[in-house]
Amino acid sequence: MATPEKWRKYLEDYIPCSFPTFLDNEGADSKSFASVLVRLEHPYGRLMSFSNNCGVDVAVVLNVAWGIVLQAYTGQDATCFAVIAESNLNIRPCRIRFTSDKVVSDILSACQSPCGEKTGDHDIPASHLSQDGGFLASEFFNTCIWGPMQGSQMPSETQAADMNRNALNLFDLVTRVEVDKSITRITLTYKRGLMREHQALAVAKAMERAISEIISGKERLDQFCLLTSEDRRQMSLWNMNLSDNSDARIETLIHEWCRWTPSAVAVCGWDGDFSYKELNELSTGVKHDLRHLGIGPEVFVPILFEKSRWAVIAMLGVMKAGGAFILLDPAHPPKRLRSICDKVSARLVVSSVQQADLAAGLAGHVVIVGGEVATAGMAQHVGEHDDSMDCIAAPHNALYAVFTSGSTGTPKGVVNSHSSFLAAMPVYLKALELDNNSRVFQFASYAFDVTIFDALMTLVAGGCVCVPSNADRSSDLTSAIQHFGTTHLSVTPTVARILDPQDFPSLKTIVLGGELSASDELLKWVNNVRVIRLYGASECTVMSIQCTSGPASSIKTINYETGNCCWVVNPQNHEQLRPLGAVGELLVEGAVVGRGYLDDASQTSETFIEAPAWLQELRQGSSTVYKSGDLVRIAADKSVQFVCRKSTQVKLRGQRIELGEVEHHVRLAIPSATECVVELITNPDASRPPMLMAFVLSDTDASTSSITARRNATSDAVFAEPSASFRSQIASITSKLRDALPSYMVPSVILPLRIMPLTSTDKINRKLLGQLAAALSREDLQLYQAQQTTYRAPSNDIEEAFQRFFAQVLGLSLDQIGADDHFFSLGGDSLTAMRLAAMARKAKFDLTVQNVFDHPELSELARHTKLVADESQEFPPPFTLVAGSKQGIVRDAARQCRLPSRVIEDVYPCTPLQKGLLAETMRDAAAFVAKIEVPLPRDVDLDRLRHAWAAVAKANPILRTRMIFSPSYGMLQVVVREDIPWIESDDVESQELVAVGRSLVQLILRRRPSTALFLHIHHAVYDGYSLPLMFAQLNNAYHGETLAFRPASAFIRYLATMPDATDYWQSMCQGLESPSFPALPHSSHRPHPDSKATHTVCVASPQAREYTPNTHVRLAWAITQAHEQGLLDVFYGTVVSGRNAPVDQIESMLIPTVATVPCRISLDVDSPVRKILHRIQDVATRGIPFEQIGLAEISHLGKDAAHACSFQTLLLMQPTAVEQNENDFFNTSTSDANYRADATYAINLFCTLENQDLSVTALYDGNIVSTDTMQRLLQNLGKSMQEIHAAPRTLIGDILKSLHSRL
C-alpha cells in the first residue's frame, strides 16, 4: 500500500494537472454533479484486437487516450490523473509525458504498468485521499478515469454507486469507461461549476476520438484529430465571413476633415496645437520635401521625435509622399536605432530639432520638422498645388513598419500595408466610438504601434490627438490626462492600476491592451467608463481580437468581432484544428494580417503561412494566415482565453520581449558564459512585480556535476554564491546590455549558476529555474546586486515618509526597507516610479520620476526632495533689506532709474554674481546679454501674448529689476512697477542694449520679413535653471492660469545671513601651487571662446551611487586635467546651482542663484575612486553655505585663494530637468544662448548626464587650445567617466595609466 509521501515522490517532476473550468464561476453551482454519455464508435472487437496485437492492456489504451485529452485541454505535455484500479477499487496515480520525439507505441509501452513499477505499489484507498484522511488528491490533479469494466470485473450496482460517490468527493471530473460485448460507452461525470452540458459532451467525444485515433494505428501525436464534426461546423459558422479589402486611402479620409472642419483642433500637444488646416498644409510641406529627396512607395522613412505634436505632421507627410514610416524612440540605445535604420537602408531620417544630432548618426541625411527654420521652409509650399490626394501608394504598399524584439539578437521589422490598416479601421472606430468630438490621449511610446492607431484612427474620425510631454507622461500622468480633457485613453493594465477613474470626469473610454488584465483590476473602471480590452499583435495591424467589458460579471469574456477570423490549431501541426475548449495555437485570417517581416523570408514563411488544407476546403482562393504563437482556448460561446506563449516570447508591462534576443546579448556581454537562460519570473504570491532574470553558467562557476545531478538539482546546487568578483562585473555587464537593448529588455537580476538544471529528457529545465528564482527572497536577490549595503533605519521624518512610500508601491513591509536602499534594487521600475511620484505629490512633496532615477537611494531621494512650499509664506517686507531711510533710498533709486518714486516697489542688495556680471557689462555693453528668439506659433494671439508676459513680470519682480550703484550701499537691485518693455521694430540689432539703471529685459517684436519675437535679457536676472521656468510660466499665463508671486527678496535675506566663509576657502586653497590650465599667452590676455566641440559617451549606471552625478563629473575632469598637465593637484572653476540654499520655494524662483567657485582636487594614485569621490562630495557639501560669496571676495582671502580664482577652465553640470521643463507653447532652444553668456574662460565645459549618456559641449579659445587637443580632452573625460562609473574600487593611478595608453 502506498503512502502520500510515495505519491509526492512519484509526481515531484510534474506540475499539478487540473482540467480547466470553462465557466465564470461567480454564481456557478460548484457542488452538484451532472453526467453525459457517449457510445464508442468502434466495437468491442477492434479494441480488444488492438490490445492483443500491441501487447498492452485495454486499460493502458484508455489511460493514454485520457492523457491525450488532458494534454489538449490543459496545454501541458506532462499530464497526470487518478486511475481507479479494476481489482480492488483503490486509487493510483498515472503520469504520462508527451514529447515530440515519442510515438504512440512508445507511450503505450511505457504505460503498460500504470506507474512503471509493480502493480499496486501506488494504490491508496479512496478514504485516505479525503480531507479527513489528511491527504488531498487535488494537490496533484482533479480528474479520474475508471475502467475498463468488462465481464466478471463489472462491479455490482451497489459497488459502482459507492465508488462513484467516493470518486466524485475527490475529483471534479470522473471518466468511466465500460467495455463489453454488449455495451461500450463513456460516461463523463462533472461538477456543474466546471462546464456546461454541451461542453462536457465535447470532452467525452474527444475521449472517444482519442481512443479511435490510437486503435487506428496512428503513431504521431501531431496527426491526432480530436475535433468533432459539431465543433468543426460551429467554427465554420463563426468564421464564414471575412472583412473586405478597401481601396480607400487614409490620407484621403483625413483630408476630408481638413476640408470640412479646417479650424478644428487636430493635434493638441504640450508644445502647441495644430488645426486641421495647419495639419494639412504642414504635412503637405513635408511631403514636397520628401518627394524631392526620392521618397515614394516601399521606401521606409525613420521618424525620430521626442513626444511632440510635430511627430504627427511627420507621419502624415511621409504617407502623403507615398513612403512608409518607422517611429523610433530616442530613449532607445543608439546602437539599436542604427540597426533598425540599417535594416531598412534608410536614405534619411525625419527628426525634431532636439533629436537632430542623434538622427545624424543614423542616416546620411536629416530632414528637420518643427522649429522656426523648418517651419518656414514648409510654409513655402502653402498655396502650391495640393496633390496629396494623387494616388501614390497602392493599397498593398507598406504603410509602416514596427520593430519588435527578435530571437536572433536583432530587432525584427513587421510590415503592415494600407489595406491591412484600413481593414481594422471600421470595427476599431465602432468599438471605441471615436468621432469628431473625441480627444485621444497618446500615452504609448513611439516604439509601439498603439501610438500609430491613436494618431491615425483619431484623425480619420475627425477627433483630436492629445500629445503629452515625456516628463508629464511619466511623472504627472493624472494631471496630463486631466489637462487635455481626455475622452479616450489607451494604456496597459499595469498603468491603469495606478490611475483613479474618479480623477477623469471627461473620460468616456479606456482601452486596455498589451498584457492580461485581472478582473478585480477592471472593477473600478467598468462602473465609470466603457472598458475596451484589446488582444492583438503587431503582425495583425495592432488588433486581432477586441472586447467590450460590460458589467463586472462578464469582464472575463473576450469576443473577437474585428471582421477577421480566428482559428485554434494543434501547436505542433496547424493542419489539425483543436476542439472547442482545447488549448491550441491561435491563427488569424483576414485582411488585417500584415505583409510579414522585413527582409526575413524564412521567419515570414514560418509565421505567415498559406491557408491549411481544412481552410481551403471551407473557402475558395488562397489567403495568408498569421500564426500568433499564443496558446488559447475558444469555448462554445465564442469566448477566448489566453493561456500562454508557445515560444520564448513574453510580455512585461505590456512590452513584447523575445527572450532569445536578450539571451543573445547576455552571451555577448559575458564571453565566459557557456550557457545562458533568460526567463520572466513571476512571484507566486505577487509580493513583487514580474521581472526579467538572466541565469548564466560560466567557465568560472560551472561544476563538474553529473547528468543525474543536473536532473535532480535543488536551489543550493543550482545557484552559485555571489562573489565579490561577480558583483564587480555586474555594472560592466549591465552597461553593455543597456547599450544594446531598450531598458525594459535588460534583466533586473543576473544569477550565476553552478549547474544548469536539466529535465528528464536532458533539456534545460526552464520551469525549475523559474520556480527556484521565484522562491528567492528579496534579501537573497540583493546579494546578487553590484552594491551591498547594511540596513540603516530612517533618521528623519522625510526619510520615514519615503520608507512608507517605497513600501506601498513595492508591496514590501517597512522593516524590509532601509534608508540606504536602492529603489530599483528593491524591485522598482519606471511604472512603480510613476506611482511613487504620484503618491509623494499627494503628500505635498515636490517629486518627479526623474528625481527617482537621479537619486534612487531612499536617503538621497529624501534629501533632494522638498515639501511644496506654503503659498501663505511671508516674504521680507519691502525696503527692509537695506539699512537707512526708506525715503532716501527710494529717492536715489528713482533718480538713477529716471522714474517717479511711486513706481519703486522694493530695493535690496545685489548678489555677488550680479555684481561681477555688471562689472563686466560696464567694460563691454554686450557682455552677458543673451539674445533669444522666441518662435511664435502660427495662430498666436499677440495681444494675449503681451498680457501673458505682463503676468509673468508681475509675478516675478526679478524681471522688473534694474541695477544701480549707491555710494552708501554699493550695488543695489531696484524693483519697479512696470511691464517688460515691448518694442516693435524690424531692426532688432540696432536696439539699445540693456544697461545699468535701465531695464535688464526687453521684448522686441519684428513684423518683417516674418513675425518673430526676440528676448534680450541680462544674465544678472536669469540663469540656466530659471530660464525654462520663465517660459513655462509664460505658457501657463497665455493659457489663463494665475501665477504665484515669487520675489527674490527671500534669497537676498538668506545671503545676508550667511556665515563667514574665510576659514572654508582659505583651508581649501592652502598651499596651491599648480599652474592654471590651460596656460594663457600672457597674464593680461582675455580669452575669446570662438570655437566649439561636442562629445557624447555612454556610461554605465554608477556603482558608487551614493555620490551625485556632479561629483562624478568633477572627478572625471580632474583626472583628465591631471593627465594633461602631468600633475596630481589640479584646480578649475565650477558653476554651482545655488538651489541647495535653505530658502523655501527656491526651486521655482526666477532668480539667478548660480555661483562660480574654484574647485581644487588633489589626486592620489594609490587611492580608489570611491575614496576620492567621497572627499570631493564632502568638500562640496560643506561648501554649500559659502558658495555665494563670489570670486572677488574669495580672491581677497589670500595669495593661494587668489591663485585658485585664476582658473581658465570652467565646468558646468547642466541639470537634467532643464530640457524636460521646457514650456508647452513657446518652445525655444536657449542652450546656446546660455553657453555663450557663460563662456568667458579659455575652456568652458557644459556637461549633461542623462540616461547613461554624458554629453559635453566645449566652447574654447582656439588660439589657446588646438582642435586636436580639445577633442583629446573630451575623449579622455568620457573615458574617465566610464571608468569611474563602472569600477569605484579602481585605483586613480590605473585610470591615469589607461589614458596614457590611449595616446
From Swiss-Prot:
One of its GO terms (molecular function) is transferase activity. It comes from the Eukaryota. The modification O-(pantetheine 4'-phosphoryl)serine is found at S830. Residues 905-1294 are annotated as: Condensation (C) domain. NRP synthetases are composed of discrete domains (adenylation (A), thiolation (T) or peptidyl carrier protein (PCP) and condensation (C) domains) which when grouped together are referred to as a single module. Each module is responsible for the recognition (via the A domain) and incorporation of a single amino acid into the growing peptide product. Thus, an NRP synthetase is generally composed of one or more modules and can terminate in a thioesterase domain (TE) or reductase domain (R) that releases the newly synthesized peptide from the enzyme. SUPFAM superfamilies: Acetyl-CoA synthetase-like, ACP-like, CoA-dependent acyltransferases. D-lysergyl-peptide-synthetase subunit 2; part of the gene cluster that mediates the biosynthesis of fungal ergot alkaloid. DmaW catalyzes the first step of ergot alkaloid biosynthesis by condensing dimethylallyl diphosphate (DMAP) and tryptophan to form 4-dimethylallyl-L-tryptophan. The second step is catalyzed by the methyltransferase easF that methylates 4-dimethylallyl-L-tryptophan in the presence of S-adenosyl-L-methionine, resulting in the formation of 4-dimethylallyl-L-abrine. Residues 256-653 are annotated as: Adenylation (A) domain. The lineage of its organism: Eukaryota, Fungi, Dikarya, Ascomycota, Pezizomycotina. The gene is lpsB. Its EC number is 2.3.1.-. This is D-lysergyl-peptide-synthetase subunit 2. Belongs to the NRP synthetase family. InterPro entries: AA_adenyl_dom, ACP-like_sf, AMP-bd_C_sf, AMP-dep_synth/lig_dom, CAT-like_dom_sf, Condensatn, PKS_PP-bd, PP-bd_ACP. It comes from Claviceps purpurea (strain 20.1) (Ergot fungus). It is an enzyme of class 2 (transferase). GO terms for cellular component: cytoplasm. The keyword NADP does not apply. PROSITE patterns: CARRIER (PS50075), PHOSPHOPANTETHEINE (PS00012). Residues 793-869 form the Carrier domain. NCBIfam families: AA-adenyl-dom (TIGR01733).
